[in-house]
Amino acid sequence: MDRYLLTATLRRDGSSRFSENNRWGLFPSAALAWTISNEPFMKATENVLSKLKLRLGYGVTGQQEIGDYQYITSYSFSTNPNTTYLGTTLLKPNGYSPDLKWEQTTTYNVAIDFGFLNNRINGSIEYYQKHTKDLLNTISAAAGTNFINLITANVGKMKNKGVEANVNAIAIQSKDFTWEVGYNITWNDSKITKLTTTFNPDYQGIDAGTNQKHQVGEMPGTFYLYQQVYDENGKPIQNAFVDRNNDGQI
């Protein structure tokens, strides 16, 4: 019976959303599995422990979810009625980022698959880490360096880690009827580790919606709100907020 399994792939993907110098990305992956329950020394436990497998995985994926033609200079007709010249609509230059390239996520995972009583009870536990670099991000462009003040660029890093577990059981199994129950649980922690090309402790992050920001050291889309002040009975005091840096301003 199979005891050792190895799978490896190598992808080379191209996207017309990047220039010729950065168009192609190389994305490897590999998976290794050891079916421990098929080892001769596990023979004595096969009536109870019907499956036990250790899995290891590694892979790199690429993301290119941005608009088209952002790496080249282009012009478009202005739709602003104030940007006309003698009744003629003007052409305006659009912002561009010639050095755009693939955003890459490297994933590592280790997992255990198990089964008891001829797999009537089975499940798995998996731990993973994901490291993303060259985040495709919207950042401010310095005055005079581009045609617009916000451009798309590869800036930033992010880390994810988590645990996923599931267990399934065949409660009833007959010729005409099978009842299977299952339970799963997931824990994930995401943290942005970099958002600028150089370290800048004063950088305030990127707006991600109403009262939300992408900020280094926090989860993506973290809500930034005023800290409420409560009275001695635990009830919120209207329009009273904590002055966190004691500068006399909220």
Language model segments and positions:
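Calcium-binding motifs, dominated by EF-hand helix-loop-helix domains
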Residues: 240-244
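Disulfide-bonded cysteine-rich modules in secreted/extracellular proteins
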Residues: 223-230
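Extracellular/periplasmic, surface-exposed regions of secreted and cell-surface proteins
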Residues: 1-218, 223
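Acidic carboxylate motifs that coordinate Ca2+ or other divalent cations, activating on Asp/Glu
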Residues: 247
